[in-house]
């Protein structure tokens, strides 16, 4: 992976969270894990203070994006966004929100202009950004807004990935009651189409196999435990199959995620947030990767939050970020192959 022509653009994330910690730790493990070249978009001073606090010997180099790959072997390249991040680890401060936002904006600009191969995002704290006037529901929605063309915002799809399992929740950050209300055949189909397209183009799976989970216990048990699986999920499966997609379902969710079952599909399409995230976080808590499908560029992220309680302590585990960097490089290579 280290022979990639273009580096990955890594965002700063919430400066008071563990983003700086794991960025530094990942660079130190670059040879051990064969990491692709990456550069961090943000404030070199923030990283320098973090490295000193953690007692890490990480040489930093402020460079232009086009020079980052060459600098990566001996230094952690930092591309300035012009925003200073002064937050203290573990003490989020709205004054650093512009630095987090600018990092995301510059990363998207770099990948869309061809300076970077993909975007990898460190965790943000939405509550902190809201204090600074951020009006998007979350990271993914902001990325979709930045990706719009001709006024059209793409439909982003969240996939959680590890080597043993890939899952996609059709409904995401809403209550269970609202998830049931929002779930429609059209939404399931449009989500699955995006999954199939990106699995083909970005992960090199020629004929993706989808397993669609039922909403209700036992996938509704022929209507005895609810009508949604017969009325909403099954028609979506039928439409996908008519389009040539290898899709099965609705399947009882409680038997979809054991080892033998996982070998029968490439991605599980789940109906709500916890149905998707509980199995993957059980299987790969430290190595899960959040992938946003449906965007005109590749975006991955570690599957965890800002972890303010351990920021600056040296306890943050970089495994999920390392996995996110490696998956982004894999997807970029597949797309250019």
Swiss-Prot record:
Catalytic activity from the UniProt record: 4-(phosphooxy)-L-threonine + NAD(+) = 3-amino-2-oxopropyl phosphate + CO2 + NADH
A Pfam family the protein falls into: PdxA
Protein's name in the database: 4-hydroxythreonine-4-phosphate dehydrogenase
Family: Belongs to the PdxA family.
Primary site of residence: cytoplasm
The keyword Repeat belongs to this UniProt entry's keyword annotation: no
Top EC class of this enzyme: oxidoreductase
Domain of life: Bacteria
Subunit details: Homodimer.
Keyword field contains Zinc: yes
Residues noted as binding substrate in the record, renumbered to the chain: 139-140, 281, 290, 299
Any one Gene Ontology cellular component term annotated for this protein: cytoplasm
InterPro entries: PdxA, PdxA_fam
GO BP annotations listed: pyridoxal phosphate biosynthetic process; pyridoxine biosynthetic process
Binding site for a divalent metal cation: 173, 218, 273
EC number from the UniProt entry: 1.1.1.262
Pathway the protein takes part in: Cofactor biosynthesis; pyridoxine 5'-phosphate biosynthesis; pyridoxine 5'-phosphate from D-erythrose 4-phosphate: step 4/5
Function: Catalyzes the NAD(P)-dependent oxidation of 4-(phosphooxy)-L-threonine (HTP) into 2-amino-3-oxo-4-(phosphooxy)butyric acid which spontaneously decarboxylates to form 3-amino-2-oxopropyl phosphate (AHAP).
Organism taxonomic ancestry: Bacteria, Pseudomonadati, Pseudomonadota, Alphaproteobacteria, Hyphomicrobiales
Location within or outside the cell: Cytoplasm
Record's cofactor remark: Binds 1 divalent metal cation per subunit. Can use ions such as Zn(2+), Mg(2+) or Co(2+).
Species this chain originates from: Rhodopseudomonas palustris (strain TIE-1)
């Amino acid at each position: 992976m280290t022979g990639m022509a273009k580096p990955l653009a890594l965002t700063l994330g919430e400066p008071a969270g563990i983003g700086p910690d794991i960025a530094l730790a990942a660079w130190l493990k670059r040879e051990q894990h064969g990491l692709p070249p990456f550069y961090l978009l943000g404030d070199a001073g923030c990283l320098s203070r973090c490295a000193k606090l953690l007692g890490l010997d990480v040489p930093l180099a402020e460079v232009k994006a086009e020079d980052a790959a060459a600098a990566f072997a001996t230094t952690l390249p930092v591309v300035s966004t012009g925003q200073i991040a002064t937050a203290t680890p573990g003490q989020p401060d709205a004054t650093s929100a512009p630095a987090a936002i600018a990092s995301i904006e510059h990363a998207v600009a770099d990948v869309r202009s061809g300076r970077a191969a993909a975007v990898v995002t460190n965790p943000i704290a939405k509550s902190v950004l809201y204090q600074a006037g951020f009006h998007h529901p979350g990271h993914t929605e902001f990325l979709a807004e930045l990706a719009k063309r001709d006024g059209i915002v793409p439909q982003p799809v969240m996939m959680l990935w590890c080597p043993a399992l890939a899952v996609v929740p059709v409904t995401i950050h809403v209550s269970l009651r609202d998830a049931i209300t929002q779930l429609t055949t059209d939404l399931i189909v449009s989500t699955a189409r995006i999954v199939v397209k990106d699995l083909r183009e970005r992960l090199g799976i020629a004929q993706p196999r989808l397993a669609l989970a039922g909403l209700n216990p036992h996938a509704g048990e022929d209507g005895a435990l609810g009508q949604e699986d017969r009325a909403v999920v099954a028609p979506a499966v039928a439409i996908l199959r008519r389009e040539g997609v290898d899709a099965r379902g609705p399947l009882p969710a409680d038997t979809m995620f054991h080892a033998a079952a996982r070998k029968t599909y490439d991605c599980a399409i789940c109906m709500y947030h916890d149905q998707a995230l509980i199995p993957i976080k059980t299987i790969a808590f430290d190595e899960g990767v959040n992938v946003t499908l449906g965007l005109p560029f590749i975006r991955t992220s570690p599957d965890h939050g800002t972890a303010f309680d351990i920021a600056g302590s040296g306890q943050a585990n970089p495994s999920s970020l390392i996995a996110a960097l490696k998956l982004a490089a894999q997807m970029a290579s597949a797309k250019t192959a």
